Amino acid sequence: METQTQYLTPSLSDSHQQPPLVWELIRWLQAVAHQWQTITRAPTEWVIPREIGIAIPHGWATESSPPAPEPGPCPPTTTTSTNKFPANQEPRTTITTLATAPLGGILTSTDSTATFHHVTGKDSSTTTGDSDPRDSTSSSLTFKSKRSRRMTVRRRLPITLPARFRCLLTRSTSSRTSSARRIKDASRRSQQTSSWCHSMDTSP
């Protein structure tokens, strides 16, 4: 049972009391020091063993301390599961991580390749682990062909220009159309003038 020692602190609230004597302060300091050494069991002697190289309290065992772990890479965060198979088949180890699963599907490992199960379950290209390997190979090939076809078809996006370049583009097109109109009008006038002159020449 622990005994609590009351500290002899000088009271500063009462101004009419006289300050404590020096021997009372010394006795209070000795009591506090003894209590601190009893609580923490602070040793009075320190040694530096050769195998450790740092100072430790005298009497501590250095042989029973567990060895420090060797520095190395972090352990992998993957889950490894080995399935039991008959004697004619080799055991298969499946390693699944969260980073390999894409969005929208569940990654299932088969003998040939990995396929994705959709939520609806109406996709004919998905396979399970109990299906025939030939069926899974054909379905995986169809899945790959669909994926490659989807990757090859790219939609061409319309080119959008900034406002200032758009203004320049409209100006250039409008100036082109206006210049073409001017050329057409001039050619019409020249044709009309030449036909009028020709009619004047041919008239009696």
Swiss-Prot record:
Residues 66-76 have a biased composition (Pro residues). Residues 189-204 have a biased composition (Polar residues). The keyword Signal does not apply. It comes from Adeno-associated virus 2 (isolate Srivastava/1982) (AAV-2). It comes from the Viruses. Residues 59-90, 118-150, 172-204 are annotated as: Disordered. Its main location: host cell. Residues 123-140 have a biased composition (Low complexity). The protein AAP uses an unusual ACG start codon. Keywords: Host nucleus. This is Assembly activating protein AAP. It is found in: Host nucleus, Host nucleolus. One of its GO terms (cellular component) is host cell nucleolus. The keyword Transferase does not apply. Plays a role in capsid assembly. Promotes the transport of unassembled capsid proteins into the host nucleolus for capsid assembly.
